[in-house]
Each structure stands twice: as C-alpha cells, then as structure tokens.
C-alpha cells in the first residue's frame, strides 16, 4: 500500500521548516492543508512560504483561489486526492502539511453524502418560516431529525434551513446521512503533529510572527484587498485571523495597538482550537517544536 505522511500542528509551531527539511531528505512533495494559503494575494498574513522556500520545496494547493471565491472541505478532498496520485506516479511520497483540521478530517475519514444546496427549496423554507415562525419550523425538524434539533437552536435559521433542506431533498435526516462516509483512503498514512510542550512558547512564537508580518507590510496587504469591491468581511478569506482585525482597524473600529492585540489573541484562540482537535486525533506521533531530532524521528517512522 503506498505511503503518505501527514504533518499537522497549530499555527506558528514550525511545520513548514520541518516539511522543507523532509523534502530535502526523503524524496517528498508537499501538499498544503491550509484554508488560508489557498488564496492568491494573501501572502504576508497567511505566513505563505517565501519564494526561496518554494524553490527548495514546491507546495501544491497554494494560490489556487481568488479571495472572492469559495472553497470547501469537499473541494479540498477532491484536489488532494488528485495531487496525491500525481506525486505517487512521479515516484515520490506525498507530504500533507498544515493546520486546517477539517481538511485533514475530510481527507482521512471521508465526507457524508449530503445533497447540494437547493436555492428554490431554501426560498420556500424561508417563506414558510415567515408565515409559521421559526419555532414551528424547529418543531418540524424535531419530528424529522430529533438529534439535529437538539444541536440546532430555533434562533439559528441558517443551520435550521440546511437541516430541513436535507430532509426534504433526500427523505433522510442529516443525522442518518452523516453516519455514511466515503471510502477509506487506500494508503498507509503515517501521521505526525508538531507543537511546543509549553503553551507559553507557542504564544510567544505567535506574537513574534504577527509583529514580523506587520514589519513586512501586512497592513498594506489588507488595504489593497479592502479596495476591491468584491471583498467583504462576510467572505471566508477575509475572516482569516489577522485579516478580519486589520480590516476592522482600517474601517476605524479601533486603533492600531488594539488591532495588534486582537489579532494576536485571535491567533492564540485558533491555536487552542487546533490543539483541541489534535489531542483527540488517533494514531498520532507527537514532535516537540524546535527539537533537532525531529527530522530523524520522522525518517525513522517512515522507513
């Protein structure tokens, strides 16, 4: 069975540096697993690998979308499977590197066969809700899908519409469909996660890296994006940590120092969520950030 390597970890933990070392030593090719690196024109605030780093170790699945475009976990899975096959055909080992855990989960575990959105049906559900009230729509969901109704509040119309839409299109509940997964990956997956043992070390790295981004011109990068008429804070690209806070600063919502503080706090919260995912992840080999033996540890596991 062909082998693939995953290298996960929170933001600012040293994934890219270790991945580039691996490319030099183990005939790997990198596939980025990062929901921010997919966007063009978002280089500084996403800590996109530099031109020198990309020359040493090309990354697949970066710069593949405009910031105005959407990209889902299902899109990622399809793209990643294609790239894995191309790398294996070239006689190399795919190395999947990043911190977007939903993408890793979609790739490794597969996705449920939920139906695509139906705009006409959504409009019909909204019309019914205006006539009957959202509580009555929630009562309908409780009859059709009791488990989902426990999770979804009557005041959360977006998720309520989706759950009802799935029931009406498929004749099955979202709960039933979510238990069906795609075929498992036909690969031997060797999984690693890298992070400092001390959370304070990670917090310092996050702060130092954001301040470096500011020195590299991050505010000007966001200012250029903000000039585009097709971008706004509702888009996933502009909700990336750092970008949202800088946009709000440029809108005059708060001063520069507050922006810096808010961006650093948001990045720390992201790292905390990433670590929470990783602690429950099965079959994971842990590496400590900054340890010289990490490369040899990975190579030993991959023989």
From Swiss-Prot:
Enzyme class name: transferase
Binding-site residues for ATP, renumbered to this chain: 9-16
SUPFAM superfamilies: P-loop containing nucleoside triphosphate hydrolases
Pfam families, A to Z: IPPT
A GO BP entry: tRNA modification
Alphabetical keyword list: ATP-binding, Magnesium, Nucleotide-binding, Transferase, tRNA processing
Marked site: Interaction with substrate tRNA: 100, 122
Catalytic activity annotation: adenosine(37) in tRNA + dimethylallyl diphosphate = N(6)-dimethylallyladenosine(37) in tRNA + diphosphate
Cofactor: Mg(2+)
Residues the entry annotates as binding substrate: 11-16
Molecular function terms from GO: ATP binding; tRNA dimethylallyltransferase activity
Region of interest (Interaction with substrate tRNA), residue spans: 34-37, 158-162, 239-244
Family label: Belongs to the IPP transferase family.
Subunit structure of this chain's protein: Monomer.
NCBIfam families cross-referenced by the UniProt entry: miaA (TIGR00174)
Name of protein: tRNA dimethylallyltransferase 1
Gene expressing this chain: miaA1
